[in-house]
Swiss-Prot record:
Region spans: Disordered: 379-405
GO terms, biological process: phospholipid translocation; retrograde transport, endosome to Golgi
Protein known as: Scramblase ANY1
Biased composition (Polar residues): 396-405
Note: Present with 937 molecules/cell in log phase SD medium.
Residues in compartment: Cytoplasmic: 1-51, 98-103, 199-223, 276-283, 336-405
Consequences of knocking out this gene: Mildly sensitive to duramycin (phosphatidylethanolamine-binding cytotoxin). Suppresses the growth defects caused by mutations of flippases including NEO1, DRS2, DNF1, DNF2 and DNF3, as well as of the DRS2 regulator CDC50, the DNF1 and DNF2 regulator LEM3, and NEO1 interactors MON2 and DOP1.
């Protein structure tokens, strides 16, 4: 019977440890041969900064506008948010997709357009679902007609409304007023009138021609988008890919691309008008403004340093849009922090001066009072027209009293 001494046991243990260590080294060497070693960490070859930047640009709209959708659903009202933002981004994205059919550009920007259309359709549906009565067409303000503006400007410079008689005093005064300086001022005023009409078109507080994007029937929004997208893409595809009319396709592509960039750069204008009208930031989320500014910064950086085959117009319009976003930032700071203090200084004895959170309620109350006065005026007019019928007159007075109560 053989026995194992302490020395033999120690030797056996050392041999076992050495064998296990060698086996683990062989296993690790085999594993490392399949996995590249980069600074002690495994990083896939496809996970580059370019890949991260491309996906940030493509999917940023999901976060920026997704938070707005959640906010509207939570508050059950779209007051303070302009649905014109949906129109701007949807039209611009459709134009960019049709432009891609003529002049292919970075696939990242095309992917962003598709994602933008998806999230804007959801945002439009949510905004229409909780659209307040203030945004309905019949409750908006009428804007002066262009002919009326031109008539006033003509009378201001030439002091003559109708055509003067030949060799009359008015005719002589009209000839004297036709100086170069006067004509230059008149032309400048006409330009300002056209510019004023354009700005009012982007102001959602005023009525537009044909009630564009101010329809009371929600189905009209979807009909317009379906018709616009179908006609735009089919015409572009037919000219560029079926007819192969290169000269016409290039000219059409330049128009579509420039128009799409212009429409997208005007995105902040409706929101600027809404904030100016309400004199409050109620309903407008700071996260949306931050996402706009971050998106503009990321887009400009990408266009300058990372993109290929990009026209300088992309950068110019992106800078213009960013300047409007900074203007909204100034509005937010003013109406959030300074305007309440200035209002309190003008009304120091008013201890019940409303806060920023009550601005939208005040606006709704003022609008209701205005509508109430219009109803009372209409009822009084009807009562005067039917004064020969005492019974009808009494009914009109009762209705007016009911509205007042």
């Amino acid at each position: 019977m053989s026995t194992t001494g302490p020395l033999d046991a120690t030797l056996i243990r050392d041999v076992a440890v050495a064998t296990a260590t060698k086996a683990s080294y062989d296993m690790s060497d085999t594993l490392y041969s399949y996995l590249p070693k980069v600074d002690q960490f495994y990083i896939p070859e496809w996970l580059t900064m370019q890949f991260i930047a491309n996906n940030l640009i493509s999917f940023t709209p999901l976060f920026s506008y997704g938070t707005t959708i959640i906010s509207i659903e939570k508050c059950k009202t779209a007051l303070g948010f302009s649905i014109d933002i949906c129109a701007t981004m949807l039209i611009a994205s459709i134009l960019r997709i049709s432009y891609y059919l003529i002049t292919p550009y970075e696939i990242t920007l095309l992917r962003q357009s598709l994602v933008m259309i998806f999230i804007q359709l959801i945002l439009l549906r949510t905004s229409l679902k909780y659209r307040p009565d203030e945004y309905k067409y019949q409750n908006l303000t009428d804007v002066e007609s262009l002919s009326h503006l031109i008539h006033d400007i003509w009378f201001e410079f030439f002091s003559c409304i109708n055509r003067p008689k030949f060799l009359s005093e008015d005719w002589k005064n009209l000839i004297k007023s036709l100086s170069f300086t006067n004509l230059l001022k008149f032309s400048f005023k006409i330009f300002l009138a056209f510019f004023y009409k354009i700005l009012k078109f982007f102001d959602p507080n005023f009525k537009r021609i044909g009630a564009f994007w101010q329809w009371d029937d929600d189905k009209n929004f979807w009909r317009f988008l379906a018709l616009f997208a179908t006609v735009q893409i089919l015409v572009t595809f037919f000219i560029s890919n079926i007819l192969n009319w290169d000269s016409l396709a290039q000219g059409l592509g330049s128009i579509i691309g420039s128009l799409g960039l212009l429409v997208e750069s005007l995105l902040p204008l409706p929101q600027i008008a809404i904030l100016y009208k309400l004199k409050s930031v109620q309903g407008f989320k700071l996260i949306l403004l931050v996402s706009w500014l971050c998106g503009d910064t990321l887009k400009i950086t990408y266009l300058i340093f990372g993109a290929k085959n990009i026209s300088a117009l992309f950068v110019i319009f992106a800078l213009f849009q960013m300047s409007l976003d900074f203007y909204i930032g100034g509005q937010y700071i003013y109406y959030r922090y300074y305007y309440p203090k200035l209002r309190h200084q003008h009304h120091p004895n008013d201890s019940n001066s409303p806060s920023d959170e009550d601005e939208s309620e005040m606006y709704e109350l003022d609008l209701f009072n205005t509508l109430q006065k219009d109803v009372e005026k209409a009822l009084k007019q009807d009562s005067n027209d039917t004064s020969d019928s005492p019974q009808d007159d009494q009914v009109g007075k009762s209705q007016a009293q009911a509205v007042t109560l």
